[in-house]
Amino acid sequence: MTVKLTIDCMGGDHGPSVTVPAAVKFVRSHPDAHLMLVGIESAIRAQLKKCKALDEPALSVVPAAEVVAMDDPVEVALRKKKDSSMRVALNHVKEGEAQACISAGNTGALMAVSRYVLKTLPGIERPAIAFALPNPTGYTMMLDLGANVDCEPQHLLQFAEMGHALVAALEGKERPTIGLLNIGEEVIKGNETIKRAGELLRASTLNFRGNVEGNDIYKGTVDVIVCDGFVGNVALKTSEGLAQMLADIIKEEFSRSLLSKLMALLALPVLLRFKKRVDHRQYNGAALLGLRSLVIKSHGSADAYAFEWAIKRGYDAVKNGVLERLSRAMAENAAPLGESGRDADGAGQASPSAGQPAEPSAALSSKT
């Protein structure tokens, strides 16, 4: 089976100078993949020429006249840029011409446009960015990592249901353990939203283990960690910054003297393994969980190596039938809060409208 993916080539801080080389390298190592490169045709072809890939049969160029900038408000992406690379890439997924979309674009815009074009799964009010973070024995699924800055307690419960369904689908665990990210383990800790979310989780049928703290994220304390997108994004980027700092410190210390350089040479295999394990770029690419089709969000600052990993996330998700397994697990195991469209509070980064965005509205004004 050929895995067909659309690439929003104009998204991110670097656009085609990163996305196109990453796509070229990916298809050369994955013969069963076909990537549709969406964006300004001249810019894409210029990069293909640099990569000596103008005639690469596994790549096709899909023109799009507009670009969603990283600082564009959501209303601009939805109402004014209907021929953007982001929108066109998602449209091809909607029409069944591709099985997933990968974008490094503006998070708020990507979430809102994805909801509008692709719609959410039944019972899902807000999609969330979910990613598997490494721990000593495997991984911990964490969500939301940036899609919804402000959440109500019922949204956190629904994130837990989606995380439960995803881990159940991928790992075969009947009752994955759930933790709520907080400033302490005690039930009295946290703001009112967190306290109320804890009450809802304890009253649910989920295997809720209570509050977890930031130092539990990489311990493997629970299978799924739930938080709002503001907290999750800060936690993720703090971790990436720490990993980079540790790698820089080790490099600096082993470069101080001739003796330390000789020691580094002896320790090179260990250092290379360490570098690989802490290189956050290989963890780039997170799923927008809760949509009816697959969308993978890359870091906006990703380089070509990191963006290639995001493409791989989409490729693997298609090959492993993640969407189908998630949908089935949600239907079998989760207890949805109600039909999509109940959310009327307007909170969140992706879109202030409830449920599925019916039509782009002038009221949409959030930025990422």
UniProtKB/Swiss-Prot annotation:
Tell me what this protein is called. Phosphate acyltransferase
The chemistry this enzyme catalyses reads: a fatty acyl-[ACP] + phosphate = an acyl phosphate + holo-[ACP]
A single Gene Ontology CC annotation of this entry is: cytoplasm
Q: Which PANTHER family match?
A: FATTY ACID/PHOSPHOLIPID SYNTHESIS PROTEIN PLSX, PHOSPHATE ACYLTRANSFERASE
Identify the keywords attached in UniProt to this record, alphabetized: Cytoplasm, Lipid biosynthesis, Lipid metabolism, Phospholipid biosynthesis, Phospholipid metabolism, Transferase
Tell me the GO BP annotations in alphabetical order: fatty acid biosynthetic process; phospholipid biosynthetic process
Tell where it localizes.
Cytoplasm
Cited SUPFAM superfamilies: Isocitrate/Isopropylmalate dehydrogenase-like
Assembly and oligomerization: Homodimer. Probably interacts with PlsY.
Q: Does the keyword Cell membrane apply?
A: no
* Family that this chain belongs to: Belongs to the PlsX family.
What molecular functions are annotated in GO for this chain? phosphate:acyl-[acyl carrier protein] acyltransferase activity
